[in-house]
């Protein structure tokens, strides 16, 4: 305690030390030893207090800095983890550093420093469509309504994002301008009928030439020319014209099909006629040569027996001429008004399957015309019922003879 501390050789203020001053003075040596021991204790005590104060101050500073370090570590961890991102297979990432284009990233897991870099994924595989339509003026000063669909995709993401502010709107304006230019240089019939394919290809070329200087990062895949129709006021007349044109095309196709069907037949028939003509020519030539040879053989006989040869030639000629003609037999000894057809006569007689000449030779003695017999009817096929009809026919025949004589 403080009263136990010595103070510049001053008397000791220990309350227990004044009880017996004599005893204190008597034992000075003993008190000197105790004072030395107390000084060591005081020194150790004071050192302990100093150390204790320093320890308390360091602990208080540690208590202040430890939570702040944890907060900083967690913040850095969250910042680092939040920088990871994924780009899909159909996309490409456009990285900007403080708003300026930096580079492109490929599909997969990537990392960026948050708050410093930004990533904008752009789909480069999807085919996008842009539809446009409108009423336009043609080259022949007609009005037509046209609808068109444009298919495109992004091939350069950086140009698509940074070259033009609104690339889709710019493409729409370029499409409208190109379509109006092509329609303005085409006639209405061409737009509505056979010129649709040409209008489509010309429009695609015009769109590509328009967007090329702007480097929009877009590639035109296809242009579909959907519909083109006239105004409603004249639609009926144009429908009739289109129907007539389609009918004409149908008739042309039918004519071509008929031509393809008839031509082979005609060619075959012509070839057959040529072959028949050649064979006929050969046959006639051979027949003429045969006649010449026959007359050459007959000539010596003609010189020997002129009358007989002439009569034989006459009979053969008449036989050849009358073989296929209708023949009428007339009996000049009786009434000339009665006549009958030899064809009808021989059709009633059963002639065997032999030559007609042989049949006549065999039956010439049995012919009813060889003998004149009274009350013999030479025309058994004529009945009394048809005599009047036969007379009418004979009168017509007589009239014909008179007309021939006149």
From Swiss-Prot:
Subcellular location: Membrane
GO cellular component: membrane
Leader sequence residues: none
InterPro entries assigned to the protein according to its UniProt record, in alphabetical order: Band7/mec-2_domain, Band_7, Band_7/SPFH_dom_sf, HflK
Residues spanning the membrane: 67-87
Region entry Disordered, spans: 1-29
A matching Pfam family: Band_7
Ranges of compositional bias, category Low complexity: 1-10
CDD domains named among the record's database cross-references: SPFH_HflK (cd03404)
Membrane topology: Single-pass membrane protein
Record's keyword annotation contains Transmembrane helix: yes
Key words, A-Z: Membrane, Transmembrane, Transmembrane helix
Amino acid composition bias (Basic and acidic residues), ranges on this chain: 11-29
The protein's assembly and partners: HflC and HflK may interact to form a multimeric complex.
Family: Belongs to the band 7/mec-2 family. HflK subfamily.
Function of the protein: HflC and HflK could encode or regulate a protease.
Identification of the protein by name: Protein HflK
Lineage: Bacteria, Pseudomonadati, Pseudomonadota, Gammaproteobacteria, Enterobacterales
């Amino acid at each position: 305690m403080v009263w136990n501390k010595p103070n510049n050789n001053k008397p000791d203020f220990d309350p227990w030390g004044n009880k017996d001053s004599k005893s204190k003075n008597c034992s000075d040596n003993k008190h000197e030893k105790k004072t030395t021991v107390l000084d060591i204790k005081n020194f150790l005590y004071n050192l302990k207090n100093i150390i204790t104060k320093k320890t308390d101050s360091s602990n208080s500073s540690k208590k202040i800095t430890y939570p702040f370090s944890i907060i900083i570590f967690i913040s850095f961890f969250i910042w680092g983890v939040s920088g990871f991102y994924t780009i899909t297979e159909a996309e490409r990432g456009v990285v900007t550093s403080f708003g300026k284009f930096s580079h492109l990233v490929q599909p997969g897991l990537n990392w960026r420093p948050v708050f410093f870099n930004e990533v904008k994924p752009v789909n480069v595989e999807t085919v996008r469509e842009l539809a446009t339509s409108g009423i336009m003026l043609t080259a022949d000063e007609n009005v037509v309504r046209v609808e068109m669909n444009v298919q495109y995709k992004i091939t350069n993401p950086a140009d698509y994002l940074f070259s033009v502010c609104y690339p889709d709107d710019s493409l729409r304006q370029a499409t409208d301008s190109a379509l109006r230019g092509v329609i303005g240089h085409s006639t209405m019939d061409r737009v509505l009928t056979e010129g649709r394919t040409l209008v489509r290809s010309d429009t695609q070329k015009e769109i590509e030439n328009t967007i090329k200087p702007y480097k929009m990062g877009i590639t035109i895949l296809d242009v579909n020319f959907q519909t083109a129709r006239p105004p409603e006021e004249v639609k009926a007349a144009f429908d009739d014209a289109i129907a007539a044109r389609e009918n004409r095309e149908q008739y042309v196709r039918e004519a071509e099909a008929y031509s393809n069907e008839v031509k082979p037949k005609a060619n075959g028939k012509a070839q057959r006629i040529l072959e028949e003509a050649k064979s006929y020519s050969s046959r006639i030539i051979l027949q003429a040569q045969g006649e010449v040879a026959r007359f050459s053989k007959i000539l010596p006989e003609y010189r020997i027996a002129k009358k007989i040869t002439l009569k034989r030639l006459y009979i053969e000629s008449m036989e050849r001429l009358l073989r296929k003609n209708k023949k009428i037999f007339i009996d000049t000894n009786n009434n000339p008004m009665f006549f009958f057809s030899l064809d009808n006569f021989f059709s009633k007689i059963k002639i065997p399957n032999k030559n007609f000449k042989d049949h006549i030779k065999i039956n010439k003695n049995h012919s009813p015309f060889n003998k004149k017999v009274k009350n013999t009817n030479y025309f058994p096929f004529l009945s009394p019922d048809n005599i009047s009809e036969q007379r009418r026919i004979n009168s017509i025949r007589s009239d014909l003879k008179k007309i021939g004589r006149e």
